[in-house]
Amino acid sequence: MVQVWYMDTEETDQRLEHHRNPPAYLELDDLYQKTGVEYFKINADEYQSDNTLTELRAKRGYTYDDEITCSEKCLPDYANKLKAFFTEHLHTDEEIRLILEGSGYFDVRDNEDNWLRIKVVKGDLIIIPAGIYHRFTLDTNNFIRTRRYFVGEPVWAPHNRPADEMDCRKSYIKHQSENFVQFNKV
């Protein structure tokens, strides 16, 4: 089950947990209200026939998917890719990830610009909304295999911060000010 907490401000090894002292955890409902990030539990061993995933794909129009493995052995240009993933950025489309194996962290900004760390493991599916500042890193296991979902042809174009003038960012801020009440939650 996914865990979420407020991060400390240490700039040591990004793969560590980085809890505040004392630790400050968030419930999934609070994560959604603060960030619009959605979470679903999926049977990773039988994801092709998982009803929740099938429903999500139909309702959200996810017509393309692929798989990516992040490890030193499997990812070409590993060090530079991890650096790019951990650079704070946003996307014009939502980012949908199903964890098939391994673990890692998605960090997202809340409405007060604090970092929230989301630990993802096998069976976790998260949807990072378009326009939210975020980043990704592996944990100390240094391995994750994920299924990525897209509406149409895949576009993974990061827009590094600052990108506040982009339409997707303005739309995100509007939804955030409304606690994501009228957002896409399925």
Swiss-Prot record:
Catalysed reactions, semicolon-separated: 1,2-dihydroxy-5-(methylsulfanyl)pent-1-en-3-one + O2 = 4-methylsulfanyl-2-oxobutanoate + formate + 2 H(+); 1,2-dihydroxy-5-(methylsulfanyl)pent-1-en-3-one + O2 = 3-(methylsulfanyl)propanoate + CO + formate + 2 H(+)
Key words, A-Z: Amino-acid biosynthesis, Cytoplasm, Dioxygenase, Iron, Metal-binding, Methionine biosynthesis, Nickel, Nucleus, Oxidoreductase
CDD domains, per database record: cupin_ARD
Compartment(s) of residence: Cytoplasm; Nucleus
Source organism, top-level taxon: Eukaryota
Main localization category: cytoplasm
Binding site for Fe(2+): 89, 91, 95, 134
InterPro entries: ARD, ARD_euk, RmlC-like_jellyroll, RmlC_Cupin_sf
EC number per UniProt: 1.13.11.54, 1.13.11.53
Coiled coil: none
Function in brief: Catalyzes 2 different reactions between oxygen and the acireductone 1,2-dihydroxy-3-keto-5-methylthiopentene (DHK-MTPene) depending upon the metal bound in the active site. Fe-containing acireductone dioxygenase (Fe-ARD) produces formate and 2-keto-4-methylthiobutyrate (KMTB), the alpha-ketoacid precursor of methionine in the methionine recycle pathway. Ni-containing acireductone dioxygenase (Ni-ARD) produces methylthiopropionate, carbon monoxide and formate, and does not lie on the methionine recycle pathway.
Protein name per its UniProtKB record: Acireductone dioxygenase
Species of the source: Drosophila melanogaster
Gene from which this protein is expressed: Adi1
